[in-house]
């Protein structure tokens, strides 16, 4: 693989995807410290919202320590060069949430849908584009459909006004060949002015390899997270990825030592538990399950005595997608009852 001379825009997820790993309990002080550290390291884009995007505060998705608006208003005035993005999932976030984020100074809106449901993004993408901001279409769980279907959905988002389309490996399921195929087709068939991005998870230990494959295939933007802080086994660990890019001659504009220090001195001490490929996170990737389901399954294991791994495998078998978190407890309860009935029958 020869990537020498290529450049890429990196996008940090530690303060949005990382909210999943922190049960959305990141303080304003922590948020500002990490964001300003990333800013000083040269990170061009930082995402800040509830883990499930603008308006995610709910019983279903979790109550954060502070509102999206409080986080955004605390961080954005402190940044000198980095721009802030906000994730929005139609059905969770509304146009009013979008307008609030822009009023706070957000520069990029990323509208996320399941990979087969791009049509629900039309209103939000159209509004963001009308308001003149960098507008990204974000196709989640993209491993579940063919490259041709991803392209079909991407073209819908492009037609609504998105100037960048992401192929998103929400489950950390993809291997490099699949990433190359899907990113390569998007790059070949979308408007040349439309950027292509890739968002990976490390559940199979492939996030860095997949991100490199995406760059080789034509991706201009790559998501990651300092120290990997994110759902499941985390996102592409950015300090490691920057080092790999530096060795391969890929220009990121990031100060390697400074981002290493942000990871080690600020993010790792914040972690509630190590972000690693443990058996449950590995099961997410192997079974193709939405990464933010991990902590829900582990909580259900403690409550009902059913293995989180068994819950995750069954969720994968049923083809569950992001937004179906409420099914996890129902499934665990059903599995516990079935096990109890088996004991009685025996």
Swiss-Prot record:
Gene (UniProt): nahM
GO BP term, example: catabolic process
Site (Transition state stabilizer): residue numbering on this chain: 16
CDD domains reported for this sequence: DRE_TIM_HOA
UniProt KW Manganese keyword: yes
Binding, Mn(2+): 17, 199, 201
UniProt-annotated catalytic positions: 20
PANTHER family named in the record: 2-ISOPROPYLMALATE SYNTHASE 1, CHLOROPLASTIC-RELATED, HOMOCITRATE SYNTHASE-RELATED
UniProt domain Pyruvate carboxyltransferase: residue ranges: 8-260
GO MF annotations in UniProt: 2-isopropylmalate synthase activity; 4-hydroxy-2-oxovalerate aldolase activity; manganese ion binding
The protein's name: 4-hydroxy-2-oxovalerate aldolase
Catalytic activity, as annotated: (S)-4-hydroxy-2-oxopentanoate = acetaldehyde + pyruvate
Protein species of origin: Pseudomonas putida
Binding site for substrate: 16-17, 170, 199, 290
Keyword Manganese: yes
Pfam family, one: DmpG_comm
Source superkingdom: Bacteria
EC number: 4.1.3.39
Pathway the protein acts in: Aromatic compound metabolism; naphthalene degradation
Family as reported in the entry's similarity comment: Belongs to the 4-hydroxy-2-oxovalerate aldolase family.
Keywords: Aromatic hydrocarbons catabolism, Lyase, Manganese, Metal-binding, Plasmid
């Amino acid at each position: 693989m020869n990537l020498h001379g290529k450049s890429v825009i990196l996008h940090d997820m530690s303060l949005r995807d990382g909210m999943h790993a922190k049960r959305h309990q990141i303080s304003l002080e922590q948020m500002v410290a990490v964001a300003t550290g990333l800013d000083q390291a040269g990170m061009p884009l930082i995402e800040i919202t509830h883990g499930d995007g603008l308006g995610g505060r709910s019983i279903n998705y979790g109550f954060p320590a502070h509102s999206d608006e409080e986080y955004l208003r605390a961080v954005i005035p402190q940044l000198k060069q980095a721009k802030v993005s906000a994730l929005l999932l139609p059905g969770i976030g509304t146009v009013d949430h979008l307008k609030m984020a822009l009023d706070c100074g957000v520069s990029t809106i990323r509208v996320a849908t399941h990979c087969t449901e791009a049509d629900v993004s039309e209103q939000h993408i159209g509004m963001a584009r009308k308001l003149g901001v960098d507008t990204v279409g974000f196709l989640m769980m993209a491993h579940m459909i063919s490259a041709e279907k991803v392209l079909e959905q991407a073209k819908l988002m492009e037609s609504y006004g998105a100037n960048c389309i992401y192929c998103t490996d929400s489950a950390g399921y993809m291997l490099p060949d699949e990433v190359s195929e899907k990113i390569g087709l998007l790059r070949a068939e979308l408007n040349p002015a439309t950027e292509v991005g890739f968002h990976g998870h490390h559940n199979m230990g492939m996030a860095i390899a997949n991100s490199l494959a995406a760059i080789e295939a034509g991706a201009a933007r790559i998501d990651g997270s300092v120290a990997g802080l994110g759902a499941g086994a985390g996102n592409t660990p950015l300090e490691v990825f920057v080092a790999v890019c530096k060795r391969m001659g890929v220009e990121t504009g990031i100060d390697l030592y400074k981002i290493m220090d942000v990871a080690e001195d600020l993010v790792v001490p914040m972690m509630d538990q190590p972000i690693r490929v443990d058996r449950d996170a590995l099961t997410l990737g192997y079974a193709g399950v939405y990464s933010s389901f991990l902590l829900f399954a582990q909580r259900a294991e403690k409550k009902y005595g059913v293995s989180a791994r068994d819950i995750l495998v069954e969720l994968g078998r049923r083809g569950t997608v992001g937004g179906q978190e409420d099914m996890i407890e129902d499934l665990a309860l059903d599995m516990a009852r079935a096990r109890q009935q088996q004991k009685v029958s025996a």
